[in-house]
């Protein structure tokens, strides 16, 4: 499922508009079964459709 209210609060985008910044390289992202599969996010609970290509205001580069 998705968490529409939290997505809106963090201005989540399915495809990042910022080069080099996306869910796949964010510390908050919980990867799915493969590199291109949808995953989850530590700051958007109850959402299993977070795209690795996505981006939101909670982005923190993975160290």
Curated annotation (Swiss-Prot):
This is High-potential iron-sulfur protein. Gene3D superfamilies: High potential iron-sulphur protein. GO terms for molecular function: 4 iron, 4 sulfur cluster binding; electron transfer activity; metal ion binding. It comes from the Bacteria. InterPro entries: High_potential_FeS_prot (IPR000170), HIPIP_sf (IPR036369). Keywords: 4Fe-4S, Electron transport, Iron, Iron-sulfur, Metal-binding, Transport. Specific class of high-redox-potential 4Fe-4S ferredoxins. Functions in anaerobic electron transport in most purple and in some other photosynthetic bacteria and in at least one genus (Paracoccus) of halophilic, denitrifying bacteria. [4Fe-4S] cluster binds at residues 23, 26, 41, 56. Homodimer. One of its GO terms (biological process) is aerobic electron transport chain. Belongs to the high-potential iron-sulfur protein (HiPIP) family.
């Amino acid at each position: 499922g998705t968490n529409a209210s939290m997505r809106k609060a963090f201005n989540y985008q399915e495809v990042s508009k910022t080069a080099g910044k996306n869910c796949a390289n964010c510390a908050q992202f919980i990867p799915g079964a493969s590199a291109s599969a949808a995953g989850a996010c530590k700051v958007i609970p109850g959402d299993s459709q977070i795209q690795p290509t996505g981006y939101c205001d909670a982005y923190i580069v993975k160290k």
